[in-house]
Regions:
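Short, surface-exposed "cap/lid" segments of acyl-processing enzymes
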Residues: 2-56, 76, 264-265
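Alpha/beta-hydrolase
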Residues: 18-19, 137, 296
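Alpha/beta-hydrolase active-site loop
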Residues: 31, 59-85, 105-108
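A short acidic, helix-capping loop that chelates divalent metal ions and anchors anionic groups
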Residues: 54-59, 302-305
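Serine-hydrolase catalytic core
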Residues: 9-10, 150, 156-327
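Short N-terminal helix/helix-N-cap motif within the alpha/beta-hydrolase-1
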Residues: 26-30, 111, 304
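Primarily recognizes the serine-hydrolase "nucleophile elbow" in alpha/beta-hydrolase
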Residues: 79-178, 208-211, 215-218, 222-226
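Residue-level signal for short, function-critical loop segments
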Residues: 21-22, 97, 140, 257-259
Length: 327
């Protein structure tokens, strides 16, 4: 299911498809109102979509299914714009938070996907269309966010309390997957609610993918943005964008300067430098957008607080500048 934000005042043949983070879905990311307003006089309209993993279903999801569904939505938008304007126009995929993992997974994995997950046996992989552009906003590490909670505590729970919860979740998850069951096992809500809330079922498989206990040497599928990932690990993700060939132009990234989901030990500017190096590789034209990628000064994770007007203005300016390079 997808929704378009558009205007009848101007022709808008080009499209941005927006994917939110864990727990998000259509109408949950408040700064999109600023983006839509900024797009009104342009040739771009914005689409949001509901994935199988949207809202409280993220704990049962996985990136292959997410990006297959994104690909189907891209095809739908292209057909819709063709019927309306006579051509598909350009399309940009923009991810917020863990939605940025969808962007990188879409661009870096085999096309179509080759996995055959027993826990999602009905999944049929599709060929993913080439994108004209891609934007990652607030790309954060779920693993490091967990480590930050273990260091600082969460709510009324001390760091020591959270360490006990985490260790128990890790032990339960490892035990659940040890037998190689073809089905997902749901972790006890009494444990997961301490971190993720009472309304979110979380499978052992997805928790291990997010927590990625074998990182940084052997990161899981969901561990794409941790600050301790080295060149060899980044080469398998950012470094695969060029050879996979699903991006016609450049990749842009915006990190929130005051992102409460990022630990204080993370060098945000350093992250952009590492990702740029891995994306561009050793040869060929640059496919990392150095001009528009940035750390947004003072921005919180979702730019949703009352004091975020200036960070939202900065974000919209960067997005509009990036889109102008594609026309």
């Amino acid at each position: 299911m997808t929704f378009e934000y558009t205007t009848s005042a101007v022709s808008q043949p080009h499209s941005i498809l927006f994917v939110g983070g864990l727990g998000d879905g259509p109408a949950t990311t408040s700064y999109l109102a600023d983006v839509v307003k900024g797009l009104q006089p342009t040739q771009w309209s914005l689409f949001t979509l509901a994935l199988t993993s949207s809202y409280q279903s993220w704990g049962l999801g996985h990136l292959d299914r997410d990006t297959d569904e994104v690909a189907q939505c891209v095809r739908y938008i292209q057909d819709y714009k063709t019927s309306k304007y006579g051509a598909a126009g350009k399309i940009v995929l923009m991810g917020h938070s863990s939605g940025s993992q969808c962007v990188l997974h879409y661009l870096s994995r085999p096309n179509p996907h080759t996995s055959k997950p027993s826990f999602d046996a009905d999944l049929e992989h599709v060929e993913r269309p080439v994108l004209d552009g891609a934007i990652m906003q607030a790309p954060v590490s779920d693993r490091e966010a967990l480590l930050w909670v273990l260091k600082t505590g969460f709510g009324d729970k001390s760091p020591q309390d959270m360490r006990v919860v985490y260790d128990n979740m890790l032990a339960a998850a490892n035990e659940a997957v040890k037998g190689g069951s073809e089905l997902d096992a749901i972790l006890p809500l009494s444990l997961t609610a301490c971190i993720y809330g009472y309304n979110t079922p979380l499978s052992a498989r997805r928790f291990l993918s997010l927590a990625s206990p074998d990182s940084p040497q052997s990161p899981s599928e969901d561990d794409l943005f941790s600050s301790d990932l080295g060149p060899a690990q980044l080469q398998q993700t950012f470094g695969r964008i060029r050879p996979v060939g699903l991006l016609r132009n450049k990749l842009m990234a915006l990190i929130s300067g005051a992102d409460q989901s990022m630990p204080d030990w993370v060098d945000k500017e350093g992250q952009l430098v590492k990702w740029k190096s891995a994306t561009n590789g050793a040869g060929g034209p640059e496919i990392w957008d150095s001009e528009h990628s940035a750390v947004i000064p003072g921005a919180s994770h979702a730019l949703s607080d009352d004091d975020q007007e200036e960070p939202r203005r900065f974000l919209v300016g960067k997005v509009l500048g990036y889109l102008q390079t594609l026309q």
